[in-house]
Amino acid sequence: MKKKCKIGDKIPKFKIPLSDGNLLDSKDIKDKKYILYFYPKDNTPGCTTEAKDFTNKIKEFKKLNTQVIGISKDSLETHNKFINKQGLKILLASDESGKVLEKFGVWVEKNMYGRKYMGIQRATFLINEESKIEYIWEKVKVKGHVEDVINKIKSS
């Protein structure tokens, strides 16, 4: 088990594909704030709500010079179907191998109805202009989350 990222840590090194055809390279995460939000699965109720909430506030994030990127294990094909079906205005990154999830400490053992399995813990990371983790929301509850993120960016 990898150690979890902490506030103040430099982000781990990684490269994963983005829904717009580009590559998300950790070395390029600088010079503005980034929201990297990790979510379990495209086209599921909580994940759809979270993606739409980020989309609905995208203009506000742009005013705050902040790039929003959602990350899950879904394929780029699934991401693009999700984006088109839901009218999303955010980028999604595909981590099919789960290596980035592990580096950020969000690939965890879960327990549902007594059954243990590995899955993504919904979490959001605020990354500052120096590529350091400024804030972490763990075990995110979707309702009101995007407003919390915006308020944190405004106060930082």
Where are these regions (language model features)?
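Chalcogenol-based redox active-site neighborhoods
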Residues: 1-156
